[in-house]
Amino acid sequence: MSEQALLSLQNIIVKREENIILNGASLVVQPGEFVYLIGRVGSGKSTLLKSIYADLPISEGEGRFGDFDLKHIKRKQIPFLRRELGIIFQDFQLLTDRSVVKNLEFVLRATGWKDKKLIQKRISEVLEQVGLESKGYKMPHELSGGEQQRIVISRALLNKPKMILADEPTGNLDPITGEQIITLLREIGDAGTSILMSTHNYAHVKKFPARIVKVEGGKLQEMQLKQDL
């Protein structure tokens, strides 16, 4: 295990309602690394992501993210862990009753930001980063699916996370829009943020090659692009 690893999971066991989903799973992710997480529906991809952001406990084994001990993390530490993680879901989960800017402002204030000028500055920065600097006044329903997912990505970037966990981020998008989202995530990764992305879209994996880890039989297996995905 590298001392510089951002994420290190060693032989972890994770359960959901007493069912063992991950059984002896191990994974190491370095700073700035892009990793695809593949596997069948129900194989444990989402369970793995939930264990990293402390939504599901690690029953056995060892887990570390940065300075956090994921197995023994205390409830009061979880908000601080999640500030270092950006989380992206396929179903957007934007607040439908407020504008893009108000969605982003809500997250910043909920994570301790108070200075109005700094809040406005950070919102402008992330909207520019995802190419939607002119859409801040829009309501979520006025945006396309691709634009909504870009807003979700901008929300994940607000606190300058060390890693982004993306759970099927292109699942509800058409192929062209999905490719645009992958391109954006790759750019974010190239800028130094680690990306751990679960996907069923092997066309994306082949077109935008990166490290591949397969979830199967409760364990994690390194895959090569030339292997049968």
Task: Locate predicted features.
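Helix-to-loop junction immediately C-terminal to a conserved catalytic motif
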Residues: 53
